């Protein structure tokens, strides 16, 4: 849609802004209709006028027809104005003078607005010079360039079409007006009459300061008036080594005047404007002449029967730091496409490295090089002339694109291309790349400080691509001083890494590197780097928690040092649960509750954790943890109450070690001691073990060997006992033959106790495996323990009746009807212990039920602060359906924002530890990882290993 202004006498009655908005809307609708008609190959041309504005609407050919006949537009405007003036009284002398004053003021304001629009457009292109605004293209493609800051209801158009009041408003509020380039206009189109071209005989474009003499650039057509003259392309280039840059097409214009007609554009010298030929130009012939105090020669690019595109290159100063993010993305796309074409061209000529593509020669010599695999509708050309959508399609089809050299390109020698001489390319490693991309130069080879990978060429594009692809996600967080410190740390790590191989490379210089520990430098440093990234991620994750809980357990490593393991479980606002190892603290000296509290407080402070969000603490239930006077839980509750008044820290003993239950409550040490000694004696001696395996094989027993009992892997207790019981005769025979008889194996009472212990440990193993399920919720754990307690009550009743249905091993050796009665006291001991563990959950049973069964919860049992929201929730059939469909905790991710208090309550319950999985996982890692060699690691290094493992 084109828009033209005509001079009309002012009319006393002006339409309101609402009327203008209606007209603009209807004109836009009419334009949309024209686009649909064009799809059906129908041509439409329409001239519309509103107030002093003339709109040209229609299809591309229709608008071209009307734009080429400006007299027709003026006649139509005069006709409409004349019709309107018939109803207006002629102005008197006073009004006539007023009109002349307003007309003069309007012209001045329009000129000022037009200059400011040119300045804003130039600023959007990245230059301080004023650049003519392509009004017609902007009105045709309104999404390409967006003008922000205009008054509501006033569309962007040429200043000649604004009334006096609008012009004044624009100048008064010009500070808020800006141009935003969403996508640059493509190369010169064949659309005539573009209004963005400077058509005056001497039109100067200067910067607002106008402090320097402008350079005048004349473009003269080389052919007669029948050949269209295309306007300049303004290229904005950031000084760098990359050959690609941005090109923004100014509006073109088709002239039917004589060939001597000249278009002039003046640019200030202070903007460092240079006229250079495009290396990738494939446009027809033209000539650019430079007048003024310049030494640049005339530049002429010729080809048979075609014109050339004149490119004005505007160099942005080095201190230009503010760049549009969209422009940076376009630059990256062009770099990627150019790199792709270079690699494909290199493959075509038989080399394994990228080779600069001769775009001009390929274009002007069709048939020499064939490019297959280009996306449909995309023509091969230099990346500087490709649209954004075309470049993206090319990258998507990268694997399909192939260059084939049919015959040599004229003037291009390919014989020496395969012998790449990097030292002759003159590339120098720049010091600023160390801080930007963490690269250093080692023996003239760029080497990455992070992954130790080297690059063959000191080229910024290659270094930047490596950093952004592999390391930017983790290392962009280091800025300013922290980045400098990290750079020095990585440099020191690289130095040690290189020195670590000195024994192999130069053993004669071994004494020089005697102080260097290769194993520590080559292996530990990367582990610390990886763990450092994980620590930073953990800190970031903790900051997003709305509620969290901690679990504390004690571990003993291979050095017999007690390690206090602190785990954290948190929930963010999206109800995503995270369960991580927070810290491990060696416990030397006393292990009192106060000492443990100080260690925990220090660890939480290290991560800047908010105490007010702490919901619960899970512990082992030892006196140092739960002592009413000086235990850790008591100290933590006091701390939370002091930080956040009214908060009540919950305490649960969810870390259950069944081996302690068996030893302390079942009192079956007389069984375990015999089994453990016998199994370890057989398995720890290779000869004994092999002979025993052979014996079992000859006897065709169920198992080929015994499981080695380990204290740390307590789950093996049940498996060892079961396998031991089923191999009693073989073990008795083998131990007797080796002079180590076991008289207990001949005692029926001892065998019955063993059988009962086998059944009981298998039940406990089943429970604990259920508790160790990953990502368990505390309500699920509560249900599992309640179920096991109910089973204990059932077993007590069955044993009183000598019903051994749930004790199959004991049943297989039972001979008397009273055998079951002997084990009732042991069941009672276990039941008492589990009731004690369950008492912690009983205190919060209503809160847990509200979380797990919100729609069946009685309102009387709900806290008063939550009652209103729970009533609304229970009456919401949509949420009830969602609850039945997805269950918990997935349901709470769909909970609406109208239940803020209930959502916080659910987040707190969800943050409570409901599993011992992560604790048992850490036990296994400690056993497998901390060998006698790894035990020599420092505490900080061992923390890194554990954190990576968990």
UniProtKB/Swiss-Prot annotation:
Keywords: DNA-binding, Nucleus, Repeat, Transcription, Transcription regulation
GO molecular function, one term: DNA binding
Main location: nucleus
Keyword Magnesium: no
Source superkingdom: Eukaryota
Gene3D superfamilies, alphabetized: GTF2I-like
Swiss-Prot/TrEMBL GTF2I-like repeat ranges: 100-194, 324-418
GO biological process, one term: transition between fast and slow fiber
Gene Ontology CC terms: nucleus
Subcellular locations according to the entry: Nucleus
Entry annotated with the keyword Cell division: no
Record Pfam families: GTF2I, zf-C2H2_12
Sequence similarity: Belongs to the TFII-I family.
Protein name: General transcription factor II-I repeat domain-containing protein 2
Lineage summary: Eukaryota, Metazoa, Chordata, Craniata, Vertebrata
